[in-house]
Curated annotation (Swiss-Prot):
Name of the protein in its database record: ATP synthase epsilon chain
Record key words, sorted: ATP synthesis, Cell inner membrane, Cell membrane, CF(1), Hydrogen ion transport, Ion transport, Membrane, Transport
Keyword set includes Lipid metabolism: no
Gene assigned in the entry: atpC
Family: Belongs to the ATPase epsilon chain family.
GO MF, any single term: ATP binding
Organism in which the protein naturally occurs: Thermotoga maritima (strain ATCC 43589 / DSM 3109 / JCM 10099 / NBRC 100826 / MSB8)
Topological type in the membrane: Peripheral membrane protein
Cited HAMAP family: ATP_synth_epsil_bac
Cellular location(s): Cell inner membrane
Alphabetical list of Pfam families matching this protein: ATP-synt_DE_N
Gene3D superfamilies named in the record: F0F1 ATP synthase delta/epsilon subunit, N-terminal
Amino acid sequence: MKVKIVTPYGIVYDRESDFISFRTVEGSMGILPRRAPIVTQLSVCDVKIKSGDDEYHLKVAGGFLLCDGKDVIIITEEAGREEDISPDRFMEARERVERVRRFFQSSL
């Protein structure tokens, strides 16, 4: 399956992958190829992606995940390897995600 992670600053990850795991606002989950379609809200979390013998770990500042059964797309304010992310920019993105989450929860 193709996994793509997109931020306002560009595409952070775009590769064929065998497995992806992450944390949603409801708990942790993973996706294998040919999974049933899903749209979910991500928590601030570490995304683990397996591609063959390689394993990638990327931090995401919340966002949304869409899986159509063939491809997985993550849309987030900030993402990258921990050592590459500006802590200030990551915290600002996290705060924006939390404000949006609180707004939508109060609207329900």
